[in-house]
Amino acid sequence: MVDPQLDGPQLAALAAVVELGSFDAAAERLHVTPSAVSQRIKSLEQQVGQVLVVREKPCRATTAGIPLLRLAAQTALLESEALAEMGGNASLKRTRITIAVNADSMATWFSAVFDGLGDVLLDVRIEDQDHSARLLREGVAMGAVTTERNPVPGCRVHPLGEMRYLPVASRPFVQRHLSDGFTAAAAAKAPSLAWNRDDGLQDMLVRKAFRRAITRPTHFVPTTEGFTAAARAGLGWGMFPEKLAASPLADGSFVRVCDIHLDVPLYWQCWKLDSPIIARITDTVRAAASGLYRGQQRRRRPG
């Protein structure tokens, strides 16, 4: 029978190996030898009866290891808060919090979250909003801005509002490729822009406009600055947050490709823990998102 008591140092070793990608790096973080890290992982695997780490470069957690990663991260957070509450030198060590957020939110409203969080160490991961919840499932992030309204196991969900996206391009691009309007035939030939291969916003706009998918040439530009520069240079049309598109539309650098827009619901998912830090970050995120559209989003109570 498996002993239900899990060893803290073994969980810490698992978390360090997966976060840093190797046993050597984990050993350096934990101030032990690589063989000691290996032994801790082996002992934990023997205890639970399953392989927890895929020993590749970089190392990654198996499906069985993911719940233990989440446990390790949550245990470390609660331990840090308990030590801080006790006071003394231990309270001087700031807690590290990992958050996943999409680039468009970071470029528009999320930076306001940083105000008043100087007592924590933030590890912000930029992820597409349709995929950021993956880091919650893997136990990497304690919170994520996501389009997923169904709670990840062990998490609460808070609706934030809707981010409005507009299809825009440079005026010369529209004159060259869309002179007769944003028709299905023109959309099939006019290059579009996408953040990466996970970015489905342009596909959503096309389906909304024509009620079907249309294959088209696409440039992939995975930074906010690069995406904007590509649109200004006339490489393609793309979906921009209304806030980012407002100034270029006002000065004539951008024009609307069509009158259709997309409202993308965003949610804040975070660990379901009685944690002052999580509560404070959640309140800060919700306040920062107060400028998002709220009219069309379905209301739901936090999970």
Swiss-Prot record:
Q: What induces it?
A: Negatively autoregulated.
Q: Which domain of life is it from?
A: Bacteria
Q: What keywords are assigned to this protein?
A: Activator, DNA-binding, Repressor, Transcription, Transcription regulation
- Specify the HTH lysR-type domain's residue ranges: 6-62
DNA-binding region residues: the ranges are 23-42
Question: How does biotechnology exploit this protein, per its UniProt record?
Answer: A wide array of epitopes was recognized on Rv1985c in TB patients. Those epitopes could specifically discriminate TB infection from BCG vaccination. These results indicate that the peptide pools selected from Rv1985c have the potential to diagnose TB infection by a method that may be routinely used in clinical laboratories.
InterPro entries (alphabetical): ArgP, LTTR, LysR_subst-bd, Tscrpt_reg_HTH_LysR, WH-like_DNA-bd_sf, WH_DNA-bd_sf
Provide the GO MF annotations for this entry.
Answer: DNA binding; DNA replication origin binding; DNA-binding transcription factor activity
Function, please? Positively regulates the expression of the exporter LysE and represses its own expression. Activity requires the presence of a coinducer, lysine or histidine. Acts by binding to lysG-lysE promoter region. Also up-regulates the expression of ppsB, ppsC and ppsD, by binding to the upstream region of ppsB.
What family is this protein classified in?
Belongs to the LysR transcriptional regulatory family.
Free-text comment about domains: Contains an N-terminal DNA binding domain (DBD) and a C-terminal regulatory domain (RD).
The protein, known as:
HTH-type transcriptional regulator LysG
Gene that produces this protein: lysG
